[in-house]
Amino acid sequence: MEEALKLNFTIFGLDEKGTMTVLMIILDMLIVAFIVWLGSIGKKRRPAGPQNLVEWTVMYICNYADSIIGEKDAPRYYALLVMLFLYIFVGNLIGLIPGLVSPTASLSVTVTLAVGVWLYTWFEGLKRKGVVKFFAHYAGPKSVPIAIRIPLFFIELLSDFSRMISLSFRLFGNIVAKEVLLSVLVTLILGFWPIVAKSVINGMIFSIAAVLRPLIIWLGVLVSLIQAGVFTLLTATYIAGAAVSHEEHSSEDEMHHINV
């Protein structure tokens, strides 16, 4: 990763890397708060520029939540999904700024996000379905023989636990890879700059690295957007599976088609 700013202090008894991560988390939250404030201005006057982008992002996430969770239940999760997307996306982008690191490039941050999502889906599922009905859905339909439902229950439960691992490591791995690639290009540019004029080969390497860096930055923005979107959309899918009964969702879809 690109060399981070050197800190002359630490907080909470953490080392320098941990302190930087905490500072980046705080910076991330402040930027997200500003974006939310910016989006709220559009309610008071005609939105333009960045406000349109914020509004479009919110509408896209809400529409996707409607299609996955259902129009009846989705609104209760709008705020969670939008804030989750903004926090991860902004956190991913922070690492593109020289001297700063993405908070999502820390495994402790991505694991915390994944565990938080998993606990929330369980909380919602238990609250809305009840203990018996919630755990029963892991065993499959009642029409399935009991000899199959018992092992299926444990397989599905293990699969549910594995979501935390896949969510956290997918985000962590992609963001770290992005920052490592940028770090390599920066090293090439800064390392070969003093001797560019002395060697044709070094000059070629420097030129290639200098051209690739803007492209890699744009690629980093794209990766940041995709990873934030994937994390958020998977969260919506997990909520739909845990907290919304298939019968309610199916009947809602039928009513929607009838109304159409």
Short names for language-model regions:
Residues 1-260:
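Selective transmembrane helix interface/packing segments
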